[in-house]
């Protein structure tokens, strides 16, 4: 080495000495932590020696508050740090989820914990990195200390500096809704596409920046790397969005504020959620990853024997389409619950949740092996429930006059079926919490063990947002209280999941995205369900409510919308849009019209011992095989976008030397989600391990397959 080179290396030593690299167990993912010259925490990330995240800053900006910070003038945790300790460790366990895609999950990572001290404020924080074979998670931790006890977060400044103008599958950043259609653009095109991307007609919309996007964010680099940015274990903290510097392609965390405009009220000891980056050169690895679940705490429920998968039906779809109604009467322009004599109200004749009608659904469920019947609109208050910012909307215990709650539950139980409770809150959160004990008492009295919740409209307390710290605490409070009563929760319009179903597995479903209901409101693009598994489903399963076999709604209603899949494409969703709670959402009479196709919905499992992603490309196609829990039977589903797809299914996952009866539900020649959606064919054959099936999926179509071991 020349003298000049030696001198230059020596000059760099003070900076280089603070750097620390931690690699994944397989050595392919590497994260390097360092401090800048000003003492600002910085990290970068590589995959197979290719840069994935360029040097990115870390830190938090605190709000000045004489009560929370005791008058301290230093109001940030951004720079001025020195490393006081680093700890490297390895963790490797295998755990068994109560339900999910896999019978058991390996949690294997290498960890770097960096202790940092800020001399100007005498504060200490820890930044912890966990590096997995498929990515990494980082979080901030705040030990208890006299100089940092209570504090308020003004902004979190966690950066994700991209290496180029990647392709992105994104939703507009919004404090209140994820019910938007995914956009597929380059990062540089987000700004120009943003306004048109927003569903301004949603019941609650609060965008914050023309380059703001939601997580989980799926990306693809020009050289073929797949990246995914999300968060895990969001507890007592606001939901994270991302704001893009579209000149430098740097994302920065953007937290949801509460009604005060502030973003987090903290008390040490505490920590933030994990900020996650997944990476692979194979899109299938993103779908198969358990990184988000692994970053959550283990199950906190001692007894989980009462938690079970659910396949259900209900009156929901006929109301969504407009044939029936939630409300019992049209007599009142507005109502006050304690001033209405419902026995004297004039029925409108369209109320779906009436005793005789619900009995038909119970009979249908019993005859077809469905465990539960969801009944929305059973309780008084639906006459003026939505978009009023009304506090006392529902009491959650009083049925309409035509809904005999005791008789219906008795009838259902006699048939081996249960009713599923519905608690729409109209986002009046305080009202729901005031009535929660009485509502759960009623459920236990009549034998309900599952509830679908809802949060349509703007939040009360007024000015708050669906994804704020306080609202996230509310959602978790409901799940915890339900667990005490052995009640499973399926939350709609709540915050997007971040893997908390591992810790509280009675959270068996979430909506938190644009679901099947939008097919009655003009439809979602055919690529919608081959994007969501890369984005929304990263944090947990979705109650997507598939199974609409009569895709042309005008055949049985006055609704002119149509479902943007083929009939067989709907069957595929039971595999692609996985979850332990699945709805057979169509009307019983429509299933009778297509009884041979409905057989797959009856047969398909909703809980799994194993899952194999066979083909995948975001926004184009997904093919997945799943092994039904406790059996040797497999089910395979393939779904594609509006361009169609030729799927090559290699049956390598079957047991060697065994034969399987294969029933294939496929798009027929000429099938098309717009022109010929109900053209399908069903074929049977005997197959074995190593066989290869080539299946053509129509535009907006797919296929479904059962493989029953002989």
Enumerate the language-model features and the residues they cover.
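Solvent-exposed beta-strand/loop surfaces of large extracellular or lumenal domains
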Residues: 91, 101-103, 170-178, 183, ...
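Carbohydrate-binding surface patches
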Residues: 618-660, 703-704
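An acidic-aromatic substrate-binding cleft motif
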Residues: 267-360, 368, 372
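C-terminal beta-strand-rich structural cap/linker in extracellular carbohydrate-active enzymes
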Residues: 684-710
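Catalytic cores of secreted or luminal carbohydrate-active enzymes
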Residues: 568-615
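N-terminal accessory beta-strand-rich subdomains and adjacent acidic, glycine-rich linkers
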Residues: 21-302
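Aromatic- and carboxylate-enriched substrate-binding clefts and catalytic-loop regions
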Residues: 376-566
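Bacterial Sec-dependent N-terminal signal peptides
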Residues: 1-21
């Amino acid at each position: 080495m020349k003298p000049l080179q030696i001198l230059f290396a020596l000059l760099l030593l003070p900076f280089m000495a603070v750097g620390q690299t931690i690699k994944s167990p397989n050595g392919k993912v590497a994260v390097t932590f360092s401090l800048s010259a000003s003492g600002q925490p910085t990290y970068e990330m590589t995959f197979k020696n290719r840069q994935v995240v360029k040097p990115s800053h870390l830190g938090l900006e605190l709000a000045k508050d004489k009560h929370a910070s005791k008058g301290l003038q230093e109001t940030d945790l951004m720079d001025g740090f020195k490393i006081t300790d680093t700890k490297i460790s390895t963790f490797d366990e295998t755990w068994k989820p109560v339900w999910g895609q896999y019978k058991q999950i390996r949690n294997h990572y290498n960890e770097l914990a960096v202790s940092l001290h800020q001399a100007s404020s005498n504060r200490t924080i820890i930044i912890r990195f966990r590096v997995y074979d498929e990515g990494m998670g980082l979080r901030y931790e705040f030990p208890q200390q006299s100089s940092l006890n209570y504090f308020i977060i003004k902004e979190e400044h966690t950066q994700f500096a991209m290496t180029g103008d990647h392709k992105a599958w994104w939703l507009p950043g919004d404090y209140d809704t994820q019910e938007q259609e995914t956009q597929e653009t380059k990062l540089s095109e987000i700004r120009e596409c943003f306004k048109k991307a927003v569903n301004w007609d949603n019941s609650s919309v609060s965008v914050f920046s023309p380059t703001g996007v939601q997580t989980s964010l799926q990306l693809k680099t020009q050289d073929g790397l797949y990246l995914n940015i999300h968060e895990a274990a969001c507890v007592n903290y606001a939901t994270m969005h991302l704001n893009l510097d579209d000149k430098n392609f740097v994302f920065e965390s953007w937290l949801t504020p509460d009604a005060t405009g502030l973003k987090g009220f903290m008390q040490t000891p505490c920590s933030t959620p994990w900020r996650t980056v997944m990476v692979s050169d194979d899109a299938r690895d993103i779908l198969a990853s358990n990184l988000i679940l692994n970053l959550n705490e283990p199950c906190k429920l001692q007894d989980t024997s009462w938690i079970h998968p659910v396949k259900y039906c209900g009156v929901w779809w006929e109301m969504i389409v407009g044939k029936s109604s939630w409300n019992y009467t049209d007599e009142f322009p507005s109502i006050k619950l304690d001033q209405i004599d419902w026995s004297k109200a004039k029925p409108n004749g369209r109320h779906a949740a009436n005793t005789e009608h619900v009995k038909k659904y119970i009979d249908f469920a019993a005859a077809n092996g469905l465990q539960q019947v969801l009944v929305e609109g059973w309780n008084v208050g639906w006459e003026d429930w939505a978009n009023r910012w009304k506090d006392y909307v529902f009491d959650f215990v009083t049925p309409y006059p035509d809904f005999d709650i005791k008789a219906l539950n008795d009838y259902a139980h006699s048939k081996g079926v249960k009713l599923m409770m519905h608690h729409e809150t109209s986002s009046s959160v305080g009202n729901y919490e005031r009535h929660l004990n009485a509502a759960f008492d009623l459920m236990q009295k009549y034998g309900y063990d599952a509830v679908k919740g809802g949060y349509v409209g703007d939040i009360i307390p007024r000015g708050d947002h669906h994804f704020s710290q306080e609202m996230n605490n509310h959602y978790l409070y409901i799940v915890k209280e339900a667990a005490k009563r052995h009640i499973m929760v399926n939350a709609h319009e709540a915050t997007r999941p971040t893997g908390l179903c591992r810790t509280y597995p009675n959270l068996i479903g979430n909506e938190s995205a644009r679901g099947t209901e939008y097919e009655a409101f003009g439809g979602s693009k055919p690529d919608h369900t081959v994007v969501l598994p890369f984005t929304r489903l990263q944090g947990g399963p979705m109650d997507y409510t598939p199974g609409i076999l009569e895709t042309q709604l005008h055949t049985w209603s006055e609704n002119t919308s149509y479902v943007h899949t083929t009939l067989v494409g709907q069957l595929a969703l039971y595999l692609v849009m996985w979850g332990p709670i699945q709805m057979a959402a169509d009307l019983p009479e429509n299933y009778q019209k297509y009884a041979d196709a409905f057989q797959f919905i009856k047969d398909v499992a909703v809980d799994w011992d194993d899952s194999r992603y066979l083909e995948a490309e975001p926004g184009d196609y997904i093919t997945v095989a799943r092994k039904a829990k406790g059996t040797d039977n497999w089910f395979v589903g393939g779904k594609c976008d509006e361009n169609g797809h030729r799927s090559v299914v290699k049956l390598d996952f079957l047991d060697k030397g065994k034969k399987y009866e294969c029933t294939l539900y496929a798009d027929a020649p000429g099938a098309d989600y717009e022109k010929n959606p109900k053209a399908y064919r069903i074929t049977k054959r005997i197959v074995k391990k190593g066989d290869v099936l080539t299946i053509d999926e129509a535009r907006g179509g797919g296929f479904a397959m059962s493989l029953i071991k002989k």
